[in-house]
């Protein structure tokens, strides 16, 4: 792919050089670039969408679809019929983002803050989404990891506590192919949000409970989901967790449950990194 950026007088390109994507030698990043980017395939045909400072245009077999920011608090779109978004929630207590050169990004940021508030349940935990009214581990964890830990720390903590089983403490596994654990073992994603929450709050007493729960989770998974011959954990993919998005139709639940997902194994590795760091902070003995 080539990425071109339309400046006031010419098209400037990012080009492949030594295996990386970089600016042309004569390009000045401070003066030559605007907020209009166009992606072009190697064959030379533009992709079906383009961005401008205040909108995006998408051309497909459905026709031309556009979304345009009218202001930082209003977007007009005809992607799924004529629709208008206007900010309706009070977001004044959250970090403010502004830009002189991209109104669309500013409006989308404000929309994201509003949707965050709308996703808080009556029990002060995050719901998975409009069609998933309860709390789900993986959905909430990624949001907490990305930013919610410091934007809404109290709701983040309550969400993590809700997604923790008791007696003994362990991370709660969302449903997946074949039901849940151990076909799916990505509950260890809980560690991502737990560490992010600790980094923001420095709450060592909460870290103690998180360490206890993830320690038991690790011991349980090492006995049930770890393949010593391969050196990897079994289990379904995370993030794109609907099997129709990630596996061919001929994959059965048994096949998925005995496969080794790269992303899920990366999460297991992070959990062990969490346990190592937390043990050092809490002064745990090396035997643990």
Set out the residue ranges of the language-model regions.
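Lectin-like carbohydrate-binding module/patch detector with strong preference for beta-trefoil
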Residues: 1-77
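Solvent-exposed, charged/polar functional surfaces in cytosolic regulatory/catalytic domains
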Residues: 111, 115, 220, 274
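Active-site cavity-forming subdomains of large catalytic enzyme subunits
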Residues: 213, 217-225
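The feature captures the catalytic groove of carbohydrate-active enzymes
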Residues: 61, 68-71, 172-188, 222-288
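Charged, glycine/proline-rich intrinsically disordered loops and linkers
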Residues: 76-88, 245
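Substrate-binding groove/exosite segments of carbohydrate-active enzymes
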Residues: 81, 88-208, 212-215
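Signature tryptophan residues that serve as conserved aromatic anchors
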Residues: 37-39, 136, 242
